[in-house]
A protein has these predicted regions:
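A short, charged, amphipathic alpha-helix used as a generic interaction element across diverse proteins
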Residues: 26-48
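N-terminal acidic leader/helix
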Residues: 1-25
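Short intrinsically disordered terminal tails
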Residues: 1-2, 47-49
Length: 49
């Protein structure tokens, strides 16, 4: 089973695929939920690193 992790900083609208201080860690167990969340962040103008 794979786990999908994402760090999100809502103040700067940046999502990271690696640990970033002052960001909230989100954990997804299902790939489809992870991808849907990434799509929603993209629609909200988030940048990814």
């Amino acid at each position: 089973m794979n786990d999908y992790l994402l760090w999100v900083d809502t103040s700067t609208k940046i999502a990271s695929f690696h640990e970033v201080e002052a960001s909230d860690l989100l954990h997804f167990e299902q790939y489809e939920n992870f991808m849907n969340y990434l799509a929603s962040l993209t629609a909200q103008g988030y940048r990814f690193q």
